[in-house]
Regions:
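Alpha-helical segment proximal to the catalytic Tyr-Lys
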Residues: 3, 47-49
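Hydrophobic structural elements of the Rossmann-like NAD(P)H-binding subdomain
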Residues: 15, 57-60, 70
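Active-site loop immediately N-terminal to the catalytic Tyr-X3-Lys motif
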Residues: 24-30
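Catalytic tyrosine of NAD(P)H-dependent dehydrogenase/reductases that use a Tyr as the general acid/base
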Residues: 32, 40
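C-terminal helical subdomain
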Residues: 59-60, 67, 76-113
């Protein structure tokens, strides 16, 4: 895809989704946390490499989110107290729809308190 984005010369946006697990150490989460940290690093590197082509690269790292997997792993957790997938989707929509230059290459952490 990046090959075609470069050729378009119209300026594009890439948004990658990582996780707070990639920036917060947790025992027993080595593989998952490492893969999410790699997404953050990849996004930052791509932002540098693609800037000359007017391609903006963002990364978001959601915290706890009410998904089917989360319900399975933490069945006693109150799902209403954590982020809903729709909330993450709204943030993604806002990031992609705005012409925000100062966020290029940033990892944006989103959490529900």
């Amino acid at each position: 895809c990046v090959k075609y984005m470069k050729a378009s010369k119209q300026g594009c946006k890439i948004l990658n989704v990582a996780s707070t697990a990639g920036i917060t150490p947790r025992p027993g989460w080595l593989s998952y946390a490492s893969s999410k940290a790699a997404i953050v690093s990849m996004s930052q590197t791509l932002a540098e490499e693609l800037a000359e082509y007017r391609i903006k690269v963002y990364c978001i790292s959601p915290g706890r989110c009410a998904t089917a997997l989360r319900r399975k792993l933490a069945p006693s957790e109150d799902q209403s107290q954590i982020m809903q997938p729709e909330e993450v989707g709204e943030i993604i929509t806002q990031l992609i729809s705005q012409n925000e230059h100062c966020l290029d290459g940033q990892n944006i952490v989103i959490r529900k308190k």
